[in-house]
Amino acid sequence: MSGNSQLPPDVIGFICSKYDIILASTSPRRYEILHDIMGITDLKTMVSTFEENLDKMNYSTDPIGYVCDTSWHKAQNIIEILTDYEDENPNEIDKPKLIICADTIIIDKSGRIYEKPKTKEVQKKFLMKFCYEDDEPVNVVTAVTLIKWYGRENFELVPFRDETKVYFDNKIPLRILEEYVESGDGLEVGGGFKIQGQGAILIEKIEGDYYNVVGLPLNKTFKGLYAEANSI
């Protein structure tokens, strides 16, 4: 991703003058969206230690609830970390924080959740299903939980989500799909494809925010940050 098209620096400067902006994720794609595209050059990071082990069987009829709850639990874990830090450093005075927690899943028309394939064999099965078996798009859902943090006794959680429909090309030659799998690209992402990489070859079109498929809905995330900065 290129950082050539950033939002006006005075807008980002306004938000950053009110809050420290923190990404609670190790995802390089989410970092690039916020740092390179949105232009938050002083972006800080934290790591949630939530195990992301919610039982999917409890969400068989509500897969979107799974991603929303995962994002929410990540935020709750960050609150615990911030609270512990505040307890250990009672005299430290920090700027208020806006912390971005997120989780992304791929869902097919039946409600099945597709996670990281980890092996090329599983990845190929995923992509063949998306391209040749399903007659409807897959749904990419990112749930975001913003933490508006002033301190352990003064914080607020602001959840939102975005959905993007991804239409795979059912006429793509199998050889091309197999070559993509052999490239190793997409093994470590949900669904087994990267829209920002060679995986885009397999995709005919999308409906919704491109950056949501990458890992974070840029438009809704920016509006969330801007709204909170304006609420002071």
Curated annotation (Swiss-Prot):
Which key words tag this protein in UniProt? Cytoplasm, Hydrolase, Nucleotide metabolism
Q: What is this protein called?
A: dTTP/UTP pyrophosphatase
The record's section on SUPFAM superfamilies has:
ITPase-like
Organism of origin is Saccharomyces cerevisiae (strain ATCC 204508 / S288c) (Baker's yeast)
Cofactor(s) the protein needs: a divalent metal cation
The processes (GO biological process) annotated in the record are: nucleotide metabolic process
What result follows from mutating residue 116 to A? Loss of activity
Note the InterPro entries from the entry. ITPase-like_fam, Maf-like
Task: Note one Pfam family from the annotation.
Answer: Maf
As one GO molecular function, the record gives: nucleoside triphosphate diphosphatase activity
According to the lineage, what is the superkingdom?
Eukaryota
Q: What is its EC number?
A: 3.6.1.9
| GO cellular component terms given for this protein | cytoplasm
According to the record, mutating residue 194 to A results in:
No change in activity
Subcellular localization(s) per the UniProt record = Cytoplasm
Task: Extract the PANTHER family matched here.
Answer: BIFUNCTIONAL DTTP/UTP PYROPHOSPHATASE/METHYLTRANSFERASE PROTEIN-RELATED, BIFUNCTIONAL DTTP_UTP PYROPHOSPHATASE_METHYLTRANSFERASE PROTEIN-RELATED
